[in-house]
Amino acid sequence: MVLLVVDTQQMITNNKLYNFEVFEERVKCLIEVARKNNIEVIYVRHDDGLDCELTKGKECFEIYEGFAPLDGEKIFDKTVNSAFRDTGLLEYLKDKGEDTVIVVGLQTDYCMDATIKCGFEHGFNMIVPEYTNSTFDNDFMSGEKTYKYHNQYMWNNRYAKCVSFHETVGMLNS
């Protein structure tokens, strides 16, 4: 089992996200509990490319201070929505014999969605703890509706197990 923290970068980890305070508190807690139990915490960052704001080398590309990786924790960079495509993450997890991925991060309707579905397709048991992913309002749906659509309808029992926060803490502690 690993804890995968997706795209919690400085540019997009802010209070404009749906339910930001709960998201922030829960992700911090899961990182802490995973570390306490020697469960590997792995980070993923999204790089939009040289002519974009969210690109390697810019401060906003770095992981949000509240979730910052410790020295030695793995960070994989990606240029597409899925954390599994051409990043080395898939091979890394397979080589370690991992089969369960607890996934948290941003954004619900972009990289979280792609990562959960691709992880499922690669045979991983994908676990999504309640209120540990988020997104922004858009022209079509509020961040809240987007969150509920993915977590309560699209992912649960199709591509992932969407479980309570407390159940996830129990998994990490066992």
Language model features by range: what are they?
Residues 48-52:
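Glycine-rich, proline-tolerant flexible connector loops at the mouths of alpha/beta enzymes
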Residues 9-15:
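Short acidic, Gly/Ser-rich segments with clustered Asp/Glu that frequently serve as metal-coordination loops
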Residues 1-7:
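Short coil-to-beta-strand
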Residues 2, 29, 35, 54-174:
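Active-site-adjacent betaalpha module
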Residues 16-43, 47:
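A short alpha/beta connector and helix-capping loop motif
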Residues 8, 46, 131:
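Active-site loop/turn elements of alpha/beta-hydrolase fold enzymes
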Residues 15-17, 53-55:
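Short, glycine/acidic-enriched capping/hinge loops at junctions between secondary-structure elements
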